[in-house]
Amino acid sequence: MPKSTYFNLALLLLAPALQAQSGRYGPAHTWWEPGQGGYLSWDESFDNADGQVTIANRKGSVQTKDHPFFEPLGTNGRACVTCHQPANAMSVAAATLRERWIESGGRDPIFAAIDGSNCPDLPQDQSASHSLLLERGLFRIALSWPPKGADRDSIRPEFRIEVVRDPTGCNTSAAYGLRGADPAVSVYRRPRVAANLDQLTAGPEGLRFMTDGREPTLESQATSAILVHEQARTRPTPDQLRRIVEFETQLYAAQGADVRGGLLDESGGPPLLGPANLSHGKAGRLAVSSDEMPRLFDIWRKPAGAPDLGLQREFRASVARGSDVFFARSFRYRVAAVTCATCHAAGITRWMDIGTTTAAAAKDSPDLPMFRITCDPSAEPHPVFGRVIYTHDPGRAMISGKCADVGAIVLGQIRGLAARAPYFSDGSARTLRDLIDFYDRRFEIGYTAQEKQDLENFLRVL
């Protein structure tokens, strides 16, 4: 019997017991501390509640000692790995952060006042001062206002921004707010996945890595992160930047095993799943070509009229149906018929406003700030909300200064989802079902209960 068959059988028999303890499967987590040293294996797996996420490096194992991604380069003890944890698919999960708060007594560098708290002038020893990070996985992002271009000259914005609600106090703070010596707007966002980056750089729009698309290259992103988030006093050296970018672009993250579905990248399985398939595929194509999409999960489909196939095969059949929902179930977006895959495909890194941050479409979040955007009469209006918009994150507009960009967010990748809840840039979807329900409500799709379950199962194995 093949090794994968033994593994899958054992997984199905033992999943309940394994979830009940911090064993090979279940809710156990591994926190990677800056400067801890050791190797990150070429193929490393970490437990999560749905199975395991796997981090694969196509160039082999990496010695993390003295590596600039893993060593602190600033003054607050952080490294790149602090906010891009392998166990969380090279991002962070809110549940992991709550565990880390307890384990470290709130002293881990990830809770640094600069952006790991709701505002730096709050009492830093209180968990309430870090509530957005602990509950929603959100870091504070301070953006200059008015925005500055690449030459650091101010851009004349097409709109006026007013603070309507400020629960963190940072946007009205004398030191950190709009009336400070260096006027800034504080928004709160999830960290992006620092893996699978060839899927982002090879697309038609090129690299758009950050939530608002403000960094043109991975080198500039790393430089900004080290100067701001690590609070370094000097810029990273060219060699440090080279090593960071080299590491990030050879790394792949995806769910590797599921407690019900078994090994996800076993030989002969769907070519869309697992980091190994990603690393072997052509950059920007989700490891497969577009004409292969409809047949991706044929091997997991349930034959018509077949009896119950058992837990694993029934789950896999559900994933196959979920892929149909993702790739083929159409709905209306503005004037066109689209599918999930229309926007969430490899290489698609455009920014758009799907309503996650604008008050007219999103559920209200009293713990986040609220801004009123009033656009100039001469400006091109927002394509949906016109010239007066209420939002807790103006998105791309904070960089471009354009009214039409208010609320527009660069689409995030959807790999390793099971390892890094919550979802959306503002952490507003606590679960995958919350994410699906948002789209169903926002675009009046009309998913059936079965379609929702199948789509959820599909997303959890990516």
Model-inferred region functions:
Residues M1-L9:
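Bacterial N-terminal signal peptides that target proteins for export
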Residues A20-L462:
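Periplasmic c-type cytochrome electron-transfer domains
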